From Swiss-Prot:
One of its GO terms (cellular component) is small ribosomal subunit. Belongs to the universal ribosomal protein uS5 family. With S4 and S12 plays an important role in translational accuracy. Located at the back of the 30S subunit body where it stabilizes the conformation of the head with respect to the body. Pfam families: Ribosomal_S5, Ribosomal_S5_C. This is Small ribosomal subunit protein uS5. Residues 1-63 are annotated as: Disordered. Part of the 30S ribosomal subunit. Contacts proteins S4 and S8. Keywords: Ribonucleoprotein, Ribosomal protein, RNA-binding, rRNA-binding. GO terms for biological process: translation.
Length: 231
């Protein structure tokens, strides 16, 4: 292409009448390879080397979301209390709703959450999300009851948990029942003392469950054999 352009420039100069003889000026050469290289470099930023990594990352995120969704489907939830709250501001009063929710998988994991919103469903959703972010693991003796008797206190609320024989069922008030049932206990004695605040009773129950120890854990703490503890 460059040679043809040089010849045409020479022919035009020679054909003009009275034109002085001048040196032919060649047109600037096009660096087609350079242009192609630039295009290739631009494409290389989005070539197949980077795309698989992004696609793999996206696929992993989708898998993790799916697994998280499947894990969340295993959890059950119970609304402990819903109350209407008021906030006094300069323009007057603002009303909203407060919700307390307990979630658990009935396999040894349970959590308690609080949510506040202008509508009841939104408050419950926030409470469920908060509860799932504050899950605890609790021991279940023989898959039915607590390993031993335990007492716990939160502010003015007190709770007692005691093992029960198989077939006895859950002997508890509605607030404590929601916690122990979602935790996975099927036979247990409970008793509440002091303040009847539902939120405080739930927190006292969770505090008691956190203090539970399996025979293996107690034997390890005392540096003894499990058989010696159980007699």
């Amino acid at each position: 292409m460059a040679d043809l352009e040089n010849k045409t420039v020479k022919a035009n100069v020679e054909n003009k009448p009275g034109a002085a003889k001048t040196q032919s000026v060649s047109a600037p050469k096009r660096t087609e390879s350079g242009a192609k290289k630039q295009i290739w470099e631009k494409r290389s930023a989005h070539d197949s080397k980077d795309m698989p990594k992004k696609s793999v990352d996206r696929a992993n995120k989708v898998k993790n979301r799916t697994r998280f969704g499947e894990a969340n489907n295993e959890f059950s939830e119970k609304v402990v209390n819903i109350s209407r709250v008021t906030k006094v501001v300069k323009g007057g009063r603002r009303f909203s709703f407060s919700a307390f929710v307990v979630v658990g998988d009935k396999k040894g994991k349970v959590g308690f959450g609080h949510g506040k919103a202008n509508e009841v469903p939104d408050a419950i959703k926030k409470a469920v999300k908060d509860a799932r972010n504050h899950l605890i693991s609790v021991p279940i003796q023989n898959k039915i009851t607590v390993p031993h008797e335990i007492h716990a206190k939160f502010l003015a609320s007190k709770v007692m948990l005691k093992p029960a024989p198989k077939g006895k069922g859950i002997v508890a008030s509605g607030t404590v029942r929601a916690v122990v049932e979602l935790a996975g206990y099927t036979d247990i004695y409970t008793k509440t003392y002091g303040s009847r605040s539902k939120a405080n009773i739930v927190r006292a129950t969770l505090k008691a469950l956190q203090q539970l120890r399996t025979p293996e854990q107690i034997a390890e703490i005392r540096d003894k054999d499990v058989k010696d503890l159980l007699g």
